[in-house]
Amino acid sequence: MLGKIKPLSFPRDYDEFLSDEKNRRLLAAYREGMNATNVFYQALTFAKVIEGMTKTIPRPDNSGAIDSRRRYMSTRIPAELSDLPVTSNEIVETFRPFLGKKFSWVREHFRPLVRNAIAHLDPDEDTLDIDRIKDVQTCERAVPVLRYIARSLLLQGFEDWSNKATQHGST
């Protein structure tokens, strides 16, 4: 993969955020994706973070949850390539089909790739194969987008957690 990757950093009080087991597990999965050398594994772990973060977003039956849920559902890939925090032109181009799209739409777009083609192996079906360059390239194009969404959701989750902790006087 080409491009400069910005380290994931949290503002003050991050240690309390990290002490929550769910948060630690999500951050561990993100770290696994960042450190993996296999693009199939990167795609799978970033998809796991996205899935996990969407499950941590409060459902509308909880207090204050409607705003959090609405915020996630409306979070989008930037509409302009220049608004992406990516320096490599090659990687920026992988975002073009997703410009302005909601995270939830992009997540559903990649579901067949990650869930079916990577996570499962059915000898009778056409699944991704690490020995086919076309399949490796498919994952290479997906990983920057999945990484961007996973990172954005983690940061959004931290912000939501931090705001909730501040409201309850625990910071």
Regions found by a protein language model. Give the residues of each.
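Amphipathic, oligomerization/interface secondary-structure segments
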Residues: 7-171
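Mobile gating loops/cap/lid regions near enzyme active sites that modulate substrate access
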Residues: 1-3
